[in-house]
Amino acid sequence: MEPFKHPIAILGAGSWGTALALVLARKGQKVRLWSYESDHVDEMQAEGVNNRYLPNYPFPETLKAYCDLKASLEGVTDILIVVPSFAFHEVITRMKPLIDAKTRIAWGTKGLAKGSRLLHEVVATELGQVPMAVISGPSLATEVAANLPTAVSLTSNNSQFSKDLIERLHGQRFRVYKNDDMIGVELCGSVKNILAIATGISDGLKLGSNARAALITRGLTEMGRLVSVFGGKQETLTGLAGLGDLVLTCTDNQSRNRRFGLALGEGVDKKEAQQTIGQAIEGLYNTDQVHALAQKHAIEMPLTFQVHRILHEDLDPQQAVQELLERSPKAE
């Protein structure tokens, strides 16, 4: 199948969904960008740009905004879901009666669904063993939209879908590397947001560069423990979806999770920090999901547990750091 002949639907018109839509449309592909907010769609249709979430990057002629989910999926084989993880299951449920046996599902969502479920498990439960794929890696939406060099991982349960999707996306400035570890890619994408909040808190408390480096490194260890328990591959940890995305999210202030942590470390109230950022903060939601998973399987994840206590038990960030520093020394 020649993938470029068929339109692709992108469900989710936030900054990341829009950036991916631009990558595809700039290659001449027909792209349908769906948002559930009718006023947002009206704005995009009238202005030819997503001024709410990704301003300054005009839509190519082949990129159209939709609010009607049925219309956005009509005649479409490939669907790319880019909504916050807490909305992922709902979107799958809504699209279920609107798709057919030829449908192939990919997502750029990073996180776990309600009940600490991996996103591919949600898709399999609702839709069966359809061709599915995950796109992940260090990819700030504004830099992708600006056509700055970016590299991501793509993993799929279907070799033809993987080949077609890579052909759709890959270019000189947006490089796509094939990966065969869906579990590892999904778990890395979930944990890195939590660790970005942790490093943001540390920097907000002015604990220094040494502390930031230690948090990233020990955070990678936590990530590895989780991936190992669920059968993911250790190689994924040092790849784009693991270390690559972790370093970017923990160190760049374009990261919403890092900015959220910075605000908390500087003493800003949680709700106020959320309102200031104005878009979904995946780590805020996924801390709860990953924490539950770690508890259930007795996985040692002290950084994740302390972030959870800060977010959900009102633990003072300074106290959380002090408790981590008082932990008994152990082998690396």
Swiss-Prot record:
List of residues binding NADPH: 15-16, 110, 141, 256, 282
InterPro entries tied to this protein: 6-PGluconate_DH-like_C_sf, 6PGD_dom2, G3P_DH_NAD-dep, G3P_DH_NAD-dep_C, G3P_DH_NAD-dep_N, NAD(P)-bd_dom_sf
GO MF, one annotated term: glycerol-3-phosphate dehydrogenase [NAD(P)+] activity
Pfam family, one: NAD_Gly3P_dh_C
Binding residues annotated for sn-glycerol 3-phosphate, in chain numbering: 110, 137, 139, 192, 245, 255-257
Pathway: Membrane lipid metabolism; glycerophospholipid metabolism
Subcellular localization(s) per the UniProt record: Cytoplasm
Domain of life, per lineage: Bacteria
Catalytic reaction list: sn-glycerol 3-phosphate + NAD(+) = dihydroxyacetone phosphate + NADH + H(+); sn-glycerol 3-phosphate + NADP(+) = dihydroxyacetone phosphate + NADPH + H(+)
GO CC list: cytosol
Any one GO BP annotation for this protein: glycerophospholipid biosynthetic process
EC number assigned by the record: 1.1.1.94
Keywords for the protein's UniProt record, in alphabetical order: Cytoplasm, Lipid biosynthesis, Lipid metabolism, NAD, NADP, Nucleotide-binding, Oxidoreductase, Phospholipid biosynthesis, Phospholipid metabolism
Active site positions: 192 (proton acceptor)
Record's function text: Catalyzes the reduction of the glycolytic intermediate dihydroxyacetone phosphate (DHAP) to sn-glycerol 3-phosphate (G3P), the key precursor for phospholipid synthesis.
Family: Belongs to the NAD-dependent glycerol-3-phosphate dehydrogenase family.
Entry protein name: Glycerol-3-phosphate dehydrogenase [NAD(P)+]
Lineage, top ranks: Bacteria, Pseudomonadati, Pseudomonadota, Gammaproteobacteria, Legionellales
Gene coding for it: gpsA
